[in-house]
Amino acid sequence: MWLYLLALVGLWNLLRLFRERKVVSHLQDKYVFITGCDSGFGNLLARQLDRRGMRVLAACLTEKGAEQLRSKTSDRLETVILDVTKTESIVAATQWVKERVGNRGLWGLVNNAGISVPMGPNEWMRKKDFASVLDVNLLGVIEVTLNMLPLVRKARGRVVNIASTMGRMSLLGGGYCISKYGVEAFSDSLRRELTYFGVKVAIIEPGGFKTNVTNMERLSDNLKKLWDQATEEVKEIYGEKFRDSYMKAMESLVNMCSGDLSLVTDCMEHALTSCHPRTRYSAGWDAKFFYLPMSYLPTFLSDAVIYWGSVKPARAL
């Protein structure tokens, strides 16, 4: 019986592999709009798709980032300045895209722009600390998508949203994990709604990678600011030893991050170019063999693992 099951699983994987390798035709005529192209995943994906001959519309936060990207790509790639927290910026970028794609519509929308800080123990934060991250990582994704959807629907195209393994398993306080859970939920509802119009929605769930999101200097400065703004009662309960150990633990996690960003951008590219993209892509060995399996464990077991491996506050019971 087990041999039959193994054979069935093997056959299914072969069929899936064959199915997923079928590529969309006329890629050179397809327009893809990508947010967050100054650096990291967005920057690499823009260059990757440009090399493949696609029409890349890259949104950068800064003119400097846009100039650097243009210097490394062909004349096909065009850039626009976009702040995903500002409605007027999103509306202007949408009009800019509309003028370029015309009646063909927008084949791909990649919501990649994101930030990680403020990030740390929840009790060290204020409402504005959560809001600043949610404004970029979740509300920015939603507003950009709502504005671009008519163009994507016209092309019967793709929406690719960058979530995280932290959208499956919340390890850190602050708005980051909350925002990524929100991206997962938004993408799920969007996928079910847009299937009637031939639009496919894919979610990318990277593990740890070396980008601006995991920049240790930025994370360290953020943690110091959060500690400084915490109340005296909170400081006494957690203690300076906890603060220092927490920072070291975060540094250890950052040091384990992969530098091979193509593991993520290859997933993004597949979601845009395959005739049969996946619903979810897990990128990185830590995602596949730690975070995702952990997310499937009963809650009491995953809580126990995290409790065993975490730093304890000074007044912990």
Curated annotation (Swiss-Prot):
The cross-references to Pfam families, in alphabetical order and at most eight, read:
adh_short
Kindly tell me the pathway this chain contributes to.
Answer: Cofactor metabolism; retinol metabolism
Q: Which cysteines are joined by disulfide bonds?
A: none
Name the positions where NADP(+) binds.
Answer: 33-57
**Example GO biological process term?**
retinol metabolic process
The UniProt annotation places substrate binding at: S164
Q: Where in the cell is it found?
A: Microsome; Endoplasmic reticulum
Give the enzyme's EC designation: 1.1.1.105
| Recorded catalytic activity of this chain's protein | all-trans-retinol--[retinol-binding protein] + NAD(+) = all-trans-retinal--[retinol-binding protein] + NADH + H(+)
Q: What GO cellular component is one of the record's annotations?
A: intracellular membrane-bounded organelle
**Family per similarity comment:** Belongs to the short-chain dehydrogenases/reductases (SDR) family.
Name of the protein in its database record: Retinol dehydrogenase 7
UniProt source species: Rattus norvegicus (Rat)
Gene giving rise to this polypeptide: Rdh7
